């Protein structure tokens, strides 16, 4: 795992055990779930224990608990940056604990761990594979319209109007429907929806987003096998000098073909803690970020410069919502207004629990932003809930 254990002292191990106990205690006080809104109370929203955690930063909570070990804090800060795009000084204590308590908890070295805890199933395309599978039946039925940018969404007395620019034809098209699922990031939805509802405008002002730089490096042959940790799917560089550096993923690590060959390394930088990061992304070209990624990888892999044949950088100005203090409490109240109208939510003919979907009379909003942080499970479940509401 990523938790530093080699050469650490007993004081560090003791803090690992104390943090493990604290995560377990937090889970007993109020359950953590993924998707997170499965744990919301239908009438009051976020549990009082979670509201208290949501009111402070994770760093402040750790200080409160007397957890100040440098190795533990490095690991926890990495986990926050990896999932939330910003470190423990910026995300809430709720978010820091949710990372562990909603999954398998935190296990200190020597503690019993379930056999399946470390099992990881991935695809070379990452979440791209999941989106391709979700899109395939829509494409087969002619229901997927790509190469189109939505310019305006407006509720009318009879339904919903959507104005969209077709990049293939160069024309603006108007689509009409009885209802619409708006699966856009909140900051985009607030600009696209005409006369946005108050909760959407408030969320756009309240939420904060982390910029990311993602660098894909094509290698014509495997990197040299060097002493140290064995190659893995997710590889973290301890002491990465790049701001926000998270290490890299090897796209071919879980290929069934055991023969070594060309591969792609994806290096990530989460820039939520970097001042003016969005401006830096906009003004510094792709070459700057590509060179930074190669320099970081050249430390553990000196032969990367000889193996690299192509470098592609993608800059995300608003990659994901950061769960800063107060966000969970705020978002938990939005879905409590209930489903507009009197329609029942049905799935396969069975009535479903009404999930807290932000909605107006004709628009249902579905995006991981409404959960305050970005993972596939949140996005998928919110889309599913919005689809049931619209159904």
Predicted feature residues:
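Feature captures the FAD/FMN-dependent oxidoreductase FAD-binding
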Residues: 1-12, 137-144, 151-161
């Amino acid at each position: 795992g990523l938790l530093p254990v080699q050469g650490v002292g007993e004081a560090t191990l003791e803090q690992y055990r104390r943090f493990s106990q604290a995560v377990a205690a937090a889970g007993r006080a109020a359950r953590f779930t993924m998707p997170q809104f499965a744990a919301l109370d239908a009438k009051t929203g976020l549990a009082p224990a979670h509201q208290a955690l949501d009111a402070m930063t994770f760093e402040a909570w750790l200080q409160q608990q007397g957890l100040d070990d440098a190795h533990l804090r490095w690991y926890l800060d990495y986990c926050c940056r990896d999932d939330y795009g910003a470190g423990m000084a910026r995300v809430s204590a709720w978010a820091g604990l949710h990372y562990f308590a909603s999954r398998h908890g935190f296990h200190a070295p020597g503690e019993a761990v379930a056999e399946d805890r470390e099992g990881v199933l991935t695809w070379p395309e990452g979440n791209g594979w999941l989106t391709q599978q979700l899109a395939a039946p829509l494409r087969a039925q002619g229901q997927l319209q790509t190469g189109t940018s939505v310019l305006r969404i407006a509720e009318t007395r009879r339904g919903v109007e959507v104005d969209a620019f077709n990049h293939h034809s160069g024309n603006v098209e108007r689509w009409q429907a009885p209802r619409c699922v708006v699966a856009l990031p909140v900051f985009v939805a607030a600009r696209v929806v005409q006369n946005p509802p108050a909760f959407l405008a408030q969320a756009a002002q309240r939420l904060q987003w982390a910029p990311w730089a993602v660098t894909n490096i094509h290698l014509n042959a495997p990197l040299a096998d060097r002493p140290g940790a064995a190659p893995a799917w997710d590889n973290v560089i301890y002491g990465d000098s790049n701001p926000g550096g998270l290490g890299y993923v090897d796209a071919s690590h879980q290929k069934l073909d055991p023969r070594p060959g060309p591969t792609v390394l994806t290096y990530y930088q989460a820039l939520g803690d970097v001042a003016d990061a969005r401006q830096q992304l906009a003004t510094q070209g792709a070459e700057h970020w590509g060179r930074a990624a190669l320099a970081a990888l050249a430390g553990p892999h000196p032969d990367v410069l000889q193996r690299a044949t192509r470098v592609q950088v993608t800059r995300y100005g608003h990659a994901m919502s950061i769960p800063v203090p107060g966000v969970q409490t705020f978002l938990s109240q939005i879905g409590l207004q209930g489903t507009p109208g009197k329609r029942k939510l049905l799935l396969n003919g069975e009535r479903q629990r009404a999930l807290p979907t932000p909605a107006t009379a004709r628009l249902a909003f579905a995006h991981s932003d409404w959960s305050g942080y970005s993972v596939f499970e949140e996005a998928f479940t919110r889309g599913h809930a919005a689809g049931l509401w619209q159904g």
